[in-house]
C-alpha cells in the first residue's frame, strides 16, 4: 500500500496515511489516460460550426442569364457553389462531438491518473480543509505553507462554499469535490491537494 505524509492546514506533517493499492497504487496506463483525455476534450467542444448550402444562401432565385445565345457558360443560379458568395458543398453542420468510453476504461483511467500523482510524489493529503469565511488570502497562505506554487487541484469530500470561493481567484488553482474528480483535471495540474475524507470517498467509489 502506498504511504504518504498527512498534513494539517498549517503545512505541518501530523502523521502518515496509507492509500488503497487498487486506486492509488496501480501501474499507470498511458494509453487509457490518453483515450480518457481525448474523450473529455471532445465533450468540451461546442460543435456550433455551420456553413450555408445553396438553398440557405440569400438570393439567387432567378437564372442570371438565358440558357443559350450569350456565349457564356450556362448558369442556373448565382448562389450555386462555384460562384463567389455561393453555397458551400458538404460544409460543417452543428453536431455533438461527445462520446463515452466504457465504464471500466473510465475507472481505469482515473485510477491511473491518481496513481501517477502518487508515483511522481505530486499528491498532498490534508487532515482537513476548512475556512471560516471566503478569503483568497487565507487559501493562498495554506497553499504557500504546503509549498505549492504551481497549478494545483484542490479536492474535498463535499462541496465547501468558503473553500470554492477562496480558491477560484488564485491563478492555476481549481476546486472540485471527490465526486467531480476527473482525469483531465488531475493530469493538467502539477499538484493534487486532497483531504483525508475525500481520499476515503474516492476509494469507496473506485476500489
Swiss-Prot record:
The keyword Cell division does not apply. InterPro entries: Ribosomal_uL4, Ribosomal_uL4-like, Ribosomal_uL4_dom_sf. Keywords: Ribonucleoprotein, Ribosomal protein, RNA-binding, rRNA-binding. SUPFAM superfamilies: Ribosomal protein L4. GO terms for biological process: translation. GO terms for molecular function: rRNA binding; structural constituent of ribosome. The keyword Ligase does not apply. GO terms for cellular component: ribonucleoprotein complex; ribosome. Residues 60-71 have a biased composition (Basic residues). Residues 44-78 are annotated as: Disordered. HAMAP family: Ribosomal_uL4_B (MF_01328_B). Part of the 50S ribosomal subunit. Belongs to the universal ribosomal protein uL4 family. One of the primary rRNA binding proteins, this protein initially binds near the 5'-end of the 23S rRNA. It is important during the early stages of 50S assembly. It makes multiple contacts with different domains of the 23S rRNA in the assembled 50S subunit and ribosome. Forms part of the polypeptide exit tunnel. This is Large ribosomal subunit protein uL4. It comes from Halalkalibacterium halodurans (strain ATCC BAA-125 / DSM 18197 / FERM 7344 / JCM 9153 / C-125). The gene is rplD.
Amino acid at each position: 500500500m502506498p504511504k504518504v505524509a498527512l498534513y494539517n492546514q498549517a503545512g505541518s506533517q501530523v502523521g502518515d496515511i496509507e492509500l488503497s493499492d487498487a486506486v492509488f497504487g496501480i501501474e499507470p496506463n498511458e494509453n487509457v489516460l490518453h483515450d480518457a483525455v481525448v474523450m473529455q476534450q471532445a465533450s468540451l467542444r461546442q460543435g456550433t460550426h455551420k456553413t450555408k448550402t445553396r438553398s440557405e444562401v440569400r438570393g439567387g432565385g432567378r437564372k442570371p442569364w438565358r440558357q443559350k445565345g450569350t456565349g457564356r457558360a450556362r448558369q442556373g443560379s448565382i448562389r450555386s457553389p462555384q460562384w463567389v458568395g455561393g453555397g458551400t458543398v458538404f460544409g460543417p453542420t452543428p453536431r455533438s462531438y461527445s462520446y463515452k468510453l466504457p465504464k471500466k476504461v473510465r475507472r481505469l483511467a482515473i485510477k491511473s491518473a491518481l496513481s501517477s500523482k502518487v508515483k511522481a510524489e505530486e499528491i498532498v493529503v490534508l487532515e482537513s480543509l476548512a475556512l471560516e469565511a471566503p478569503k483568497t488570502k487565507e487559501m493562498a497562505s495554506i497553499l504557500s505553507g504546503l509549498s505549492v506554487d504551481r497549478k494545483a487541484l484542490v479536492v474535498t469530500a463535499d462541496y465547501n462554499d468558503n473553500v470554492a470561493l477562496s480558491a477560484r481567484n488564485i491563478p492555476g488553482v481549481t476546486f472540485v469535490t471527490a465526486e467531480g474528480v476527473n482525469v483531465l483535471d488531475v493530469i493538467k495540474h502539477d499538484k493534487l491537494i486532497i483531504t483525508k475524507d475525500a481520499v476515503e470517498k474516492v476509494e469507496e467509489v473506485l476500489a
